[in-house]
Amino acid sequence: MKLKVGKTTLTLSYPLACVTAAVLILDTSGKVLLCFCAALMHEGGHLFALRCCHTPPEEIKLSLFDAAIIDRKKQLHPFSHELAITLSGIAVNFLSASVGWVLYSIHPHPLLKVFIAAHLTLGIFNALPVDSLDGGQALLLILERFFPPDRAERLLLLLSVLILLPTAIIGFWLLLVTKYNFTLLLSALYLTSLLLLKPRKPHRKTSAKRPQIPVS
């Protein structure tokens, strides 16, 4: 499902559209909808930063488990702009959680707790220095300031493995103890699959191009 918004093409997967429709119909509590809103606000932070840098994205792809903002001109961005664009989604989540906390201190509504938890969880998750997450891509930008691109990618890959391996072990232990809590294990396996499936192009010594940076 594609929609043209100015110079940007918005692609929405059918599974995501079906799940969104089901949530709107079945979620009478509003909790799942708040989690969806947190994810949308995260992506909106990236779009706002791109807009501020006067570089609207060429395409936005939204699927059930991922979101990608395609910006083929990102190699022309200054380092500060690219870093701000990468971290803007996390910043929106933490800012929203802070606002929610202030509102909750004034009027302690149960849905505000869900709002705060959704934004904090999404912000902390994306801030992890793992490849394919915003934190990992921001770290890659910084590493490429000091190392060649191929070495920077290897360092990020090593750090990602060092984080995901114990996370998967802890997630498996939680599943055994609780019999139902599989969220952490599923997240670790999902990120590991992205890490394994990510295409890695060989770098030439004479020309060092940054890989495409997906924004989640």
Which residue stretches match the model-derived regions?
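Hydrophobic transmembrane alpha-helices and their immediate loop junctions
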Residues: 1-216
